[in-house]
């Protein structure tokens, strides 16, 4: 019984897991994900991790010049790759399974929000 109780006492709550993750990885930022995508910040807000990315382009106005259909395709490609990467990470999967959610925010180089979405446990389960 004592061993069981100790293992429960050490179990992380979603808030604690998010805080520990953000504290650890914040020290490694900024992180260049691809030549056009940089992770600039990770914040924990309760049981939510907020990831702030900057999208860089050769021409700063390139995003604004995309037709709506092209912009939606661009966003969908980033979301698909980002979800695939998150759902392969064991630490992320463990956090999602205990109730942590990931808010993914994507900004232009001048700080304008381009799009955002949330990753939850069920999103990764759909990929399996």
Regions found by a protein language model. Give the residues of each.
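Extracellular/lumenal and peripheral-membrane lipid-interaction modules
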Residues: 29, 33, 73-79, 97, ...
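Sec-dependent signal peptide recognition
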Residues: 1-4
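Short, intrinsically disordered, charge-biased short linear motifs at domain edges
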Residues: 18-20, 70-77, 109-114
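N-terminal signal peptide c-region/cleavage motif recognized by signal peptidases
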Residues: 6-9
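Mature extracytoplasmic domains of secretory-pathway proteins
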Residues: 44-93
């Amino acid at each position: 019984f004592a061993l069981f109780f100790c293992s429960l006492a050490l179990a992380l709550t979603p808030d604690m897991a998010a805080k520990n993750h953000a504290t650890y990885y914040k020290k490694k930022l900024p992180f260049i994900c691809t030549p056009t995508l940089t992770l600039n910040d990770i914040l924990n807000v309760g049981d939510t991790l907020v990831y702030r990315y900057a999208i860089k382009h050769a021409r700063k106005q390139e995003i604004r010049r995309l037709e709506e259909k092209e912009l939606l395709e661009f966003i969908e490609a980033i979301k698909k790759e980002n979800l695939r990467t998150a759902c392969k990470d064991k630490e992320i999967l463990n956090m999602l399974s205990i109730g942590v959610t990931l808010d993914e925010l994507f900004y232009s180089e001048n700080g304008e929000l381009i799009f955002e979405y949330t990753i939850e446990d069920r999103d990764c389960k759909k990929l399996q």
